[in-house]
C-alpha cells in the first residue's frame, strides 16, 4: 500500500513539474518578446543621439560611431526592463553576452533580433505557425495554421499541443467544418468559408428558412420552412396569472399586466380580463373608482380630507390640522413670538421681566 501511494505521489509530482515547465516556457517566450519590443523602442529613442562630449566628430572617429557603440547598447539595455519585472531582469542578466554578441557581430547578418535571440539562440520561442519544444508545425500547416479559421494552441511558443481552437463559425480538428447555425458557402481541401444560417435554423445548407435541416428551439417546420412557434397561442399560458404573453421571434416574453387588471390578455387597462379592486369597467376598460366622489362620505373624522389614489384612496388631516392620537387637531402657532422695540431689539418677555422686578422693589 505504501509503495502504491509513493508511486502515485511520484507520478503526480512529475505531472506538476511538466505543467510548470510548460507554463515557464510560455512565460519565457512572452518575456523575450517584450524584451525585444523594448529593445526596438530603445533604438528609436537613441536614434538621434551622439556621444554628447562636445567634439562629436573626433569622438565618432576615435571611439567608433555612436550608432553601433557600446555606450548606446548600455543605454538601451538599462531601459529594457522595469525594476519590478523579475523575469525580464533575470533574462537580461543571464543572456547579456548573447545580446552583446548580436549587437557587435550578428546584427547586420541577422537583423531580426526576435528570430535570432528568442527563437534560435536562447530557444524560448518558436517561429510563427509552430509550437512545442521542437517547434513542430501546427495543424493545418505552419503557413496557415488551422486553415486560417482558428488559433493553434502554443503558436510561436515552446509550449502547447498544436491543436486548433476554432472560431465560432468553424469546428473539427482542422477548423474546416461548419459549426451548428452555419453552412459551407465555399469549400476545398485547404479552404472553407462558413456563413450564418437563417435565424430559424439550427443546421442548414443555405441562407433561407427553406434551407433548414433542423429548426431551432422556438421554431417549427411548416410547409418545408422553419417558422416561429407562437407559444402565446397555446391554451395554457406560459406566464403567471398577473402577466400576459408577448410572442417574439423564436421565443416569448412575460410582461406584467396593468395595475387596473386582475389578469389580462395584453398591454393596458383595455385588455383586462377582470378589474382589480378599486377599478370598474367603463367604456371597455378598467377605470379607477373615485371613492372621494361617492355620495356617502368615506372619511368620517372631523377636519379630515379624502385623497383619491390609483385603485384606492387616503384619508388625511385637512390643511392646518395634524393627526394626534387618531384625531385631526389644529396646529398651534408658537406662543413666544418676540416683538422688537427700537434698534436695541428689546423683546416683550424682557419688558415683563423688568416690570416684575421693578414691582418687587
Swiss-Prot record:
Annotated organism of origin: Xenopus laevis
Q: Which cysteines are joined by disulfide bonds?
A: 138-152, 146-164, 166-175, 292-306, 299-315, 317-328
Instruction: Quote the SMART domains the UniProt record gives.
Output: EGF (SM00181), EGF_CA (SM00179), FU (SM00261)
Known function = Possible role in neuronal acetylcholine receptor transport.
Q: Which residues form the signal peptide?
A: 1-24
Entries under Pfam families matching the protein? DUF3456, EGF_CA
Name the chain's protein.
Answer: Cysteine-rich with EGF-like domain protein 2-A
Q: Where is this region: Disordered?
A: 341-361
GO cellular component, alphabetical, reads: endoplasmic reticulum; extracellular region
Instruction: Report the PROSITE patterns cross-referenced here.
Output: ASX_HYDROXYL (PS00010), EGF_1 (PS00022), EGF_2 (PS01186), EGF_3 (PS50026), EGF_CA (PS01187)
Q: Which residues cross the membrane?
A: none
Q: What is its main location?
A: secreted
**GO molecular function annotation:** calcium ion binding
* Known glycosylation sites: 188, 303, 352
Compartment(s): Secreted; Endoplasmic reticulum
Give yes or no: UniProt keyword Repeat.
Answer: yes
> What family classification does the UniProt entry report for this protein?
Belongs to the CRELD family.
Q: Where are the FU repeats?
A: 191-238, 251-298
EGF-like domain: residues covered: 134-176, 288-329
Task: Write the gene name.
Answer: creld2-a
Sorted UniProt keywords = Calcium, Disulfide bond, EGF-like domain, Endoplasmic reticulum, Glycoprotein, Repeat, Secreted, Signal
Amino acid at each position: 500500500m505504501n509503495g502504491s501511494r509513493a508511486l502515485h505521489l511520484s507520478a503526480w509530482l512529475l505531472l506538476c513539474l511538466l505543467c510548470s515547465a510548460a507554463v515557464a516556457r510560455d512565460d519565457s517566450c512572452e518575456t523575450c518578446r517584450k524584451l525585444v519590443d523594448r529593445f526596438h523602442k530603445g533604438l528609436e529613442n537613441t536614434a538621434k543621439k551622439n556621444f554628447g562630449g562636445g567634439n562629436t566628430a573626433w569622438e565618432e572617429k576615435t571611439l567608433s560611431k555612436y550608432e553601433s557603440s557600446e555606450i548606446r547598447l548600455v543605454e538601451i539595455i538599462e531601459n529594457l526592463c522595469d525594476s519590478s519585472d523579475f523575469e525580464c531582469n533575470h533574462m537580461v542578466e543571464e543572456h547579456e553576452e548573447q545580446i552583446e554578441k548580436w549587437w557587435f557581430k550578428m546584427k547586420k547578418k541577422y537583423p531580426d533580433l526576435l528570430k535570432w535571440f528568442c527563437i534560435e539562440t536562447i530557444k524560448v520561442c518558436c517561429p510563427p505557425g509552430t509550437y512545442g519544444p521542437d517547434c513542430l508545425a501546427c495543424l493545418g500547416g505552419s503557413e496557415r495554421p488551422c486553415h486560417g479559421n482558428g488559433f493553434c494552441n502554443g503558436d510561436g511558443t515552446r509550449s502547447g499541443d498544436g491543436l486548433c481552437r476554432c472560431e465560432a463559425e468553424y469546428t473539427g480538428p482542422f477548423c474546416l467544418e461548419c459549426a451548428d447555425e452555419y453552412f459551407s458557402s465555399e469549400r476545398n481541401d485547404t479552404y472553407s468559408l462558413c456563413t450564418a444560417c437563417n435565424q430559424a435554423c439550427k443546421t442548414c445548407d443555405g441562407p433561407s428558412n427553406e434551407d433548414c435541416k433542423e429548426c431551432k428551439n422556438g421554431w417549427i417546420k411548416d410547409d418545408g420552412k422553419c417558422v416561429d412557434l407562437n407559444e402565446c397561442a397555446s391554451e395554457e399560458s406560459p406566464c403567471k396569472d398577473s402577466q400576459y404573453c408577448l410572442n417574439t421571434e423564436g421565443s416569448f416574453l412575460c410582461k406584467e399586466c396593468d395595475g387596473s387588471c386582475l389578469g389580462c390578455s395584453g398591454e393596458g387597462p383595455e385588455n383586462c380580463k377582470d378589474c382589480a379592486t378599486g377599478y370598474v369597467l367603463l367604456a371597455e376598460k378598467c377605470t379607477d373608482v373615485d371613492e372621494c366622489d361617492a355620495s356617502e362620505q368615506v372619511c368620517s373624522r372631523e377636519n379630515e380630507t379624502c385623497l383619491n389614489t390609483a385603485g384606492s384612496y387616503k384619508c388625511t388631516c385637512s390643511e392646518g390640522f395634524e393627526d394626534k392620537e387618531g384625531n385631526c387637531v389644529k396646529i398651534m402657532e408658537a406662543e413666544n413670538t418676540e416683538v422688537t422695540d427700537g434698534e436695541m431689539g428689546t423683546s416683550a418677555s424682557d419688558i415683563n421681566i423688568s416690570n416684575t422686578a421693578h414691582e418687587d422693589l
